[in-house]
Amino acid sequence: MPGRGGLIALTLTLMFVILWARPASTQNDDADAALFERYIEALRRIAHVPGISAVILRDGRPVWQRGFGFANVDARVPATPDTLYDIASLTKTFTSTLLLQCVERGTLSLDERIARYSAAIPEPAATVRHVLTHTSQGTPGAAFRYDGDRFAALTSVVDSCHGRPFRQALATSILDRAAMTNSVPGHDLERPTPSLAALFDVPTLGRYEGSVKRLALPYQTAADGSAPAGYPPRDISASAGLLSSVVDLAKYDVAIDTNVFIFRASQELAWTNAVSTTGEALPYGLGWFIQRERGVRLVWHYGQWPQYSALYLKAPDRHLTLILLGNSGGLSEAFPMAGGDVMASPFAKAFVRIFIP
């Protein structure tokens, strides 16, 4: 009996046979979305994700959004585009934007030593840029090694250059500006301590509390399916912890593409591969993975907790975006994307094959 990875590969092979046999003339958004739905539902079951919410944007507007499975299995609460999830490491893309806002204002240089802001990185020569590009380990700048714990050191950098705590900067400089009214900068705001509550006004705290009620329950994948699980850490850092929905992340995507947060030149800098000290192009830029697939530029990030997972994939030159959120680790945990290849994900592979012919 093949394992889960083998079953996913077999399913993809069979479904790609169907796709390859489809006449090119039948390719359009409605037909493509219908075919993609079949992939998502089949992969959701094999990867043991109880619920998935998904959106596709083309030319700055959502052209398809759907929920699959359940946000709460026992209560049979369906996953919808408005369902909230912990988006895990997709939070890193927000951190990138917050730091580049500081660079634009002149309150930060990416080439400052990270030690000025945090003692968490032991390499004395490591800079903010090194941490942001996952090149701070060993000889800074020499090699890429994805490390979410190190990335969390950027929390204190945002605190300093924005002049306010990370979660408050995230709320005021990104969430509010993009009208992401259902997103919550930290699960701990459901029942905030007095010091956390002091960061936001009463209506905002009430909105956060209401939004958390739509948070999908967490599950962990197991050999025979998925099982209820505890929540991941409830606080937030530069590395992870934002709660959001695909509806709100679609607003974020549109705001990125219309330069609401930072100048286009700054965004393109974030989407440029870092270069090692030996001249090697690395798979990561400033808070984003970057690669080319069949000549098409892809910028992306994945999110991974044992209980939640996520995928955010953009083809900016094609004005095309996919966002997937799930309430187990199944969107990411079986697929080695940390090395820099989004095509290790069958979800991404299906999307690229269908929508980027």
Model-found features: residue ranges?
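Bacterial N-terminal signal peptides that target proteins for export
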Residues: 1-10
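Well-ordered alpha-helical segments within folded domains of soluble proteins
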Residues: 95-96, 150-155, 247-250
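Active-site helix/loop module of the DD-peptidase/beta-lactamase fold
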Residues: 35, 51, 81, 86-90, ...
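Catalytic loop of the DD-peptidase/beta-lactamase superfamily, centered on the K-T-G motif
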Residues: 27-66, 164, 171-172, 176, ...
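Carbohydrate-binding/catalytic loop surfaces
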Residues: 190-232, 236-238, 284, 289-291
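Bacterial N-terminal signal peptides
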Residues: 9-19
